[in-house]
UniProtKB/Swiss-Prot annotation:
Cofactor: Mg(2+)
Lineage: Bacteria, Pseudomonadati, Pseudomonadota, Gammaproteobacteria, Enterobacterales
Name of the protein: Pyridoxine/pyridoxal/pyridoxamine kinase
Coiled coil: none
Protein family per UniProt: Belongs to the pyridoxine kinase family. PdxK subfamily.
Enzyme class: transferase
Species this protein is from: Escherichia coli O1:K1 / APEC
Functional note: B6-vitamer kinase involved in the salvage pathway of pyridoxal 5'-phosphate (PLP). Catalyzes the phosphorylation of pyridoxine (PN), pyridoxal (PL), and pyridoxamine (PM), forming their respective 5'-phosphorylated esters, i.e. PNP, PLP and PMP.
Catalytic reactions of this protein: pyridoxal + ATP = pyridoxal 5'-phosphate + ADP + H(+); pyridoxine + ATP = pyridoxine 5'-phosphate + ADP + H(+); pyridoxamine + ATP = pyridoxamine 5'-phosphate + ADP + H(+)
GO terms classed as biological process: pyridoxal 5'-phosphate salvage
Annotated positions binding Mg(2+): 136, 162
Amino acid sequence: MSSLLLFNDKSRALQADIVAVQSQVVYGSVGNSIAVPAIKQNGLNVFAVPTVLLSNTPHYDTFYGGAIPDEWFSGYLRALQERDALRQLRAVTTGYMGTASQIKILAEWLTALRKDHPDLLIMVDPVIGDIDSGIYVKPDLPEAYRQYLLPLAQGITPNIFELEILTGKDCRDLDSAIAAAKSLLSDTLKWVVITSASGNEENQEMQVVVVSADSVNVISHSRVKTDLKGTGDLFCAQLISGLLKGKALTDAVHRAGLRVLEVMRYTQQHESDELILPPLAEA
């Protein structure tokens, strides 16, 4: 068979369930470097679109790389359509974005994509910062999230700090965090999963709160003391996998949290500074 036929017969195009748009590292387990293997462990196909490409996270003594140029980034997205690789697409997830212009490019691509995929699940992890570090992305990214991605998302997964930035509301107690999350809900944005709500410090618990228009569910997990990076990226990968495998939202959140705890403990047992995925036991 000629190479011309092999690479131009679109009926042969590789298909994916998920397009994951976020950071990638050469060394380490953050962004798509942890999300892609986690999604594949769940038996789903995924295309990874990088927003930044780094040697490793900046927490090490040295790191190299940076944001993907807009021309490349838009080309990566466009190529998936040119290859006719999105016929079976079910979800798009976003994580760490390198620039506000990437967010705008992505939003334009998603808007066009939804015309052919009206049931597409768009899940946004609005990576902005955290309480300990403050904002650790470019200062124009929060407004870009508000303007371009939140209006397209069906679900978002902010931590408490990110929820405060997106809403401009104080969220340091559970009731105020829930109220802030509800203020973001719309005809499009159906749910908010708050990934670091106030937990019980004495009982070493942390809480994840699932907020929708008609329900609020608080899920408590054991708190694991760790400096491991990429746990939020892993959580989102597990969450989207659970949803696509037919789990209800709250159940998918609960299972995702348990999987993250399992991975963290497994990693600690192996004395690694980077997350290690153990085999996935099918529940």
